[in-house]
């Protein structure tokens, strides 16, 4: 071969190893790829950074309650369309879309169950259904969960995640703030404990009513909690907001919540609180807790 000869190359084709979709999930805190299975096995919390991914209402109930103890109630309560509201789509069409996306008939799941044998009435919100907004059906279900606690003389626990009142129902949605708060007043008069757990995000009319009326208020780490969002406040006040404004850590520092509890510790922490506020204070409940 001379200096002017064109060299020949052999191209060897190799098959690129493809990683199946869904094996890894990016951690928003560290930016690293984490095995999805490791996150799922840790209640959708990244083991290293502690980042809490959103979960559905039924998943949360599965993490919290004794196996087989949950009995769902108020399944028949559904959203109506009293205002015949239409924006880019009719309200009933939106409801059907939310039902399909979330697998739920409404933004909250209610029922009764047990935590280490202690009976409780629960309402657990799900952000996937219309952003967890509070409408007349959701408000009715939450009120009934509180009334169940009163009737059965058991504690009430509400997990909140919401964008606020549901605009498609107008004043009927706003009325649920007063309705649920009044029911909690009756629960307090019956001297029964109410534990409120705030998860990301809890805003608007929900944060301004039952979410912040608990005898004990817990929150998951890093949750956004407030009435108006930080962008709206910044645009309105024309001021720079402090770091971490409206996070659960900020609220704990300023005395607006009682504890921050990681999801993986929530079941045990709730049990401790129930023992202090209910079992030890109510002699008749001790035998129920052991059953």
Curated annotation (Swiss-Prot):
Q: Single GO molecular-function term?
A: ATP binding
Group of enzyme by EC: transferase
* UniProt xrefs under SUPFAM superfamilies: ClpP/crotonase (SSF52096)
State its location(s). Cytoplasm
Identify the Pfam families for this entry.
Answer: Carboxyl_trans (PF01039)
Keywords from the UniProt entry: ATP-binding, Cytoplasm, Fatty acid biosynthesis, Fatty acid metabolism, Lipid biosynthesis, Lipid metabolism, Nucleotide-binding, Transferase
Task: Tell me the ranges covered by the CoA carboxyltransferase N-terminal domain, including all copies.
Answer: 23-291
Task: Spell out the GO cellular component terms annotated for this protein, sorted alphabetically and separated by semicolons.
Answer: acetyl-CoA carboxylase complex
Q: EC annotation? A: 2.1.3.15
The protein's predominant localisation is: cytoplasm
How does the annotation summarize its subunit structure?
Acetyl-CoA carboxylase is a heterohexamer composed of biotin carboxyl carrier protein (AccB), biotin carboxylase (AccC) and two subunits each of ACCase subunit alpha (AccA) and ACCase subunit beta (AccD).
What does the protein in this record do?
Component of the acetyl coenzyme A carboxylase (ACC) complex. Biotin carboxylase (BC) catalyzes the carboxylation of biotin on its carrier protein (BCCP) and then the CO(2) group is transferred by the transcarboxylase to acetyl-CoA to form malonyl-CoA.
List, alphabetically, the PANTHER family matched: ACETYL-COENZYME A CARBOXYLASE CARBOXYL TRANSFERASE SUBUNIT BETA, CHLOROPLASTIC
The UniProt similarity line reads: Belongs to the AccD/PCCB family.
What's this protein's name?
Acetyl-coenzyme A carboxylase carboxyl transferase subunit beta
Gene name?
Answer: accD
């Amino acid at each position: 071969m001379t200096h002017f000869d064109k060299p020949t190359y052999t191209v060897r084709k190799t098959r690129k190893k493809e990683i199946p979709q869904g094996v890894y999930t990016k951690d928003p805190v560290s930016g690293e790829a984490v095995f999805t299975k490791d996150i799922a096995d840790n209640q959708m919390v990244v083991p290293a950074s502690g980042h809490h991914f959103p979960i559905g209402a039924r998943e949360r109930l599965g993490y919290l309650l004794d196996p087989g103890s949950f009995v769902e109630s108020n399944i028949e309560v559904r959203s109506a369309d009293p205002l015949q509201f239409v924006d880019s789509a009719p309200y009933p069409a939106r409801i059907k879309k939310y039902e399909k996306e979330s697998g739920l008939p409404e933004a909250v799941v209610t029922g009764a169950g047990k935590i280490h044998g202690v009976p409780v009435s629960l309402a657990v919100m799900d952000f996937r259904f219309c952003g967890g907004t509070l409408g007349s059906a959701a408000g009715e279900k939450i009120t009934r969960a509180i009334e169940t606690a009163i009737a059965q003389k058991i504690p009430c626990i509400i997990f909140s995640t919401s964008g606020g009142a549901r605009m498609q129902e107008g004043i009927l949605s706003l009325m649920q703030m007063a309705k649920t708060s009044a029911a909690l007043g009756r629960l307090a008069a019956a001297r029964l404990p109410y534990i409120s757990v705030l998860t990301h995000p809890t805003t608007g009319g929900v944060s301004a009513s039952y979410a912040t009326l608990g005898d004990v208020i817990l929150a998951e780490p890093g949750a956004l909690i407030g009435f108006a969002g930080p962008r709206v406040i910044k645009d309105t006040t024309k001021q720079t907001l402090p770091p971490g404004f409206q996070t659960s850590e900020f609220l704990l520092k300023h005395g607006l919540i009682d504890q921050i509890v990681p999801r993986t510790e929530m079941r045990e922490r709730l049990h401790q609180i129930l023992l202090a506020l209910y079992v030890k204070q109510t002699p008749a409940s001790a035998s129920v807790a052991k059953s």
